[in-house]
């Protein structure tokens, strides 16, 4: 449990517009 519940899949992190309901950042486990 944690903030990752609001994070988008790393595949979606490539285009933030594809995941408005979550976040795309390093703390989400993504490289972008």
Curated annotation (Swiss-Prot):
<dbReference type="Pfam" id="PF08098">
    <property type="entry name" value="ATX_III"/>
</dbReference>
<keyword id="KW-1015">Disulfide bond</keyword>
<dbReference type="GO" id="GO:0019871">
    <property type="term" value="F:sodium channel inhibitor activity"/>
</dbReference>
<dbReference type="InterPro" id="IPR016330">
    <property type="entry name" value="Neurotoxin_3_Actiniidae"/>
</dbReference>
<keyword id="KW-0528">Neurotoxin</keyword>
<protein>
    <recommendedName>
        <fullName>Delta-actitoxin-Eqd1a</fullName>
    </recommendedName>
</protein>
<keyword id="KW-0964">Secreted</keyword>
<keyword id="KW-0166">Nematocyst</keyword>
<keyword id="KW-0872">Ion channel impairing toxin</keyword>
<comment type="function">
    <text>Binds specifically to sodium channels (Nav) of the axonal membrane of crayfish and prolongs the falling phase of the action potential. It also increases the maximum rates of rise of both action potential and resting potential. Is only active on crustaceans.</text>
</comment>
<dbReference type="InterPro" id="IPR012509">
    <property type="entry name" value="Neurotoxin_3_Anemonia"/>
</dbReference>
<dbReference type="GO" id="GO:0005576">
    <property type="term" value="C:extracellular region"/>
</dbReference>
<keyword id="KW-0800">Toxin</keyword>
<keyword id="KW-0738">Voltage-gated sodium channel impairing toxin</keyword>
<dbReference type="GO" id="GO:0042151">
    <property type="term" value="C:nematocyst"/>
</dbReference>
<comment type="similarity">
    <text>Belongs to the sea anemone short toxin (type III) family.</text>
</comment>
<dbReference type="GO" id="GO:0090729">
    <property type="term" value="F:toxin activity"/>
</dbReference>
């Amino acid at each position: 449990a944690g903030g990752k519940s609001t994070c988008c899949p790393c595949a979606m992190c490539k285009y933030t517009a594809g995941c408005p309901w979550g976040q795309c950042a390093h703390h989400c486990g993504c490289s972008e």
